[in-house]
Amino acid sequence: AFHNYLRERDIPWQVEDLAGAHAQVKQLEHELEKRLSAPDAPELICSVFAVGSEVVADALVSTGKAGQVMVIGNDLFPESALALRRGIFTNIVYKDPTSLAYRGAKTLGDYLLWGRTPTVPVQKGAVEMVFASNVDRYCELAGI
């Protein structure tokens, strides 16, 4: 959807999707370090999962690029909050996991116990952007 959005609006950004999920962390780490060391290194990195955020922070530090590349990390946890405070990340995308878990459990319970199917097949939750200026408040809310 993101690539289509850019194409439809003629936005001239070059976007690279790097492979690497939980089972491919070393591959992601290698690819990131290679890209960050290249002459045409990325100007912005967006991570879409918590482990990826950790890998991005580590790669930025190991290549000496921390604070030189805009980075949007994903999920608020102690290491991502520290990366934001230290200027390694520019922002963090925050999704309230307690609220999402509650809604998921309720939806599943309603289905299993009462046979009620959800009114919409995909439920969406609020997404908030955390900045260095408000990270302490979000950490307090999240119990970090």
Where are these regions (language model features)?
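Short beta-strand elements at the ligand-binding edges of bilobed clamshell
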Residues: A1, R86-T98
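Hinge/cleft segment of the Venus flytrap/periplasmic-binding protein
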Residues: Y5, R9, D96-I144
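A structural micro-motif
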Residues: I11-W13, G67-V69, T90
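Hydrophobic alpha-helical
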Residues: F2, E16-A81
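Short, surface-exposed amphipathic charged segments that create phosphate/polyanion-binding patches used
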Residues: L32-E33, R86, G109
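Class I S-adenosyl-L-methionine
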Residues: H3-D10, A57, R85
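Structural signal for conserved beta-strand scaffold positions within catalytic alpha/beta enzyme cores
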Residues: D17, G73, V93-Y94, F131
